[in-house]
């Protein structure tokens, strides 16, 4: 998967199109990522000893990795390519040519 935890990404499809955020969690087995401040959903939590009345929490839902593009340091969104530099495989932005790792 071309997206890693900590990458800054731009959402290119869906209700949050155009939003940028940091990847909190990458889920490679299901090809999804959790992006900070994107795809907010409400989760109803049952009452427990800490919160006797229960709560409605707002958490980020995972979105499909095809709906995001990685941003480089200059804020240019583009597809991710791989190349070998100094016997090390690195990711780079295909649009700007800048190395991401």
UniProtKB/Swiss-Prot annotation:
Pfam families to which the protein is assigned, alphabetical: KOW (PF00467), ribosomal_L24 (PF17136)
RNA-binding is among the record's keywords: yes
GO molecular function, one term: rRNA binding
Keywords on record: Ribonucleoprotein, Ribosomal protein, RNA-binding, rRNA-binding
A GO biological process held by the record: translation
Paired cysteines (S-S): none
InterPro entries per record: KOW, Rib_uL2_dom2, Ribosomal_uL24, Ribosomal_uL24_CS, Ribosomal_uL24_KOW, Translation_prot_SH3-like_sf
CDD domains reported in the protein's UniProt record: KOW_RPL26
Domain of life: Bacteria
An annotated GO cellular component: ribosome
Keyword Ribonucleoprotein tagged: yes
Cited NCBIfam families: rplX_bact
Known function: One of two assembly initiator proteins, it binds directly to the 5'-end of the 23S rRNA, where it nucleates assembly of the 50S subunit. One of the proteins that surrounds the polypeptide exit tunnel on the outside of the subunit.
SUBUNIT field: Part of the 50S ribosomal subunit.
Family under the similarity heading: Belongs to the universal ribosomal protein uL24 family.
Protein known as: Large ribosomal subunit protein uL24
């Amino acid at each position: 998967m071309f997206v890693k935890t900590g990458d800054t990404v731009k959402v290119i499809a869906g209700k949050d199109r155009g939003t940028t955020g940091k990847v909190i969690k990458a889920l490679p087995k299901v090809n999804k990522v959790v992006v900070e401040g994107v795809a907010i959903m409400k989760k109803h939590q049952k009452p427990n000893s800490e919160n006797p009345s229960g709560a409605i929490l707002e958490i980020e839902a995972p979105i499909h990795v095809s709906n995001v593009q990685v941003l480089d340091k200059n804020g240019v969104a583009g597809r991710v390519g791989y190349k070998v530099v100094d016997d090390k495989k690195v990711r780079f932005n295909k649009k700007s040519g800048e190395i991401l790792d």
